[in-house]
């Protein structure tokens, strides 16, 4: 590449705009942002800017630029944007925006743009739908060659399932207005990508979550028979569906197992919880908060249990358990979107009785745990490893560049 010539995908640098710092562990959204950051960094420099509407990590990366959420500056900036007829129309059609989109308001574009190196040719990748208005504003302000959006989940469908119809309609409006402005969109689930694409006539790629498997053993030694059963739940424990799952695990599943098993049964809850799980602490219940490394927790776990009843965000944690070689018992909601087969890669359980029976089966049935571990490990290496998914992310960016070159967006005629 000669001096002054753009690099990969027609740009010198990628600006990644996210609602949380990218990280290798601790939070599913942070891990997904890290996937895109690392995939792009193979080809060019990546500058990460975070407007932390999805929270802050304890062990934050000092190279990440944080732009604080400021309601007053956001309001004044939005008024300035509204003076532009195109933005006035966009905001009128999309309003009221979902709450996270109001916090990460497009009115913050001046502050975000000032935090970014504006030299050379740039592209902008945006993480989550609620960051889309700010992402489009930033792309226009920087003169970005192309912009992409990782939806991750179907926010409208999730809000509707949760009974929040106002939020569901807000996300539909947002994506209807801002989705067609992007050169590429993607989601973690193939089914959700298809559903979103059909509803909004958008070309939405499926890019699954991924975990690092390099350096991990191809299989975990079979644990010696023990009179202690250690149940592990790893997640963002500030997220309400995960809080409810932790409460069900400790309050319902744990007592039922104690009544049926002879040895000690314990639960370890790992992940940031902002004090919301203090009431669950007990002699046989450990609440760790954020930890920088999960290796020791997976090494000592008998079974990973994810009794999510609704919501999203646990799927990447199931992949992590697969990669570490721990048998998994999970609800259908927790495994939604993963190409898993009940009884082959994990055991599905959608209520307390099913969860208890599944855990008992893993403990009692000879060969079941090693078989689940082996099949899940094969799956994660073939479908959900960084080594497999990162090239697909780079192909996604290449398609966005190709659309930009031909004057197209990610829309379906």
Give short role names for the model-derived ranges.
Residues 1-70, 118-119:
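N-terminal subdomain of nucleotide-sugar transferases
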Residues 32-33, 211-299:
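Conserved catalytic-core segment of nucleotide-activated headgroup transferases in glycan assembly
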Residues 35-38, 106, 110-114, 154-156, ...:
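Membrane-proximal helix-turn-helix segments that form the acceptor-binding/catalytic region
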Residues 191, 209-210:
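Carbohydrate-associated surface elements
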Residues 296-313, 324-327:
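Acidic donor-binding loop of glycosyltransferase active sites
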Residues 317-320, 327-331:
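Short hydrophobic beta-strand element within catalytic cores of glycosyltransferases
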Residues 346-353, 361-367:
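Conserved acidic donor-binding segment of nucleotide-sugar-dependent glycosyltransferases
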Residues 368-383, 389-395:
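A short, well-ordered alpha-helix in the C-terminal region of glycosyltransferases
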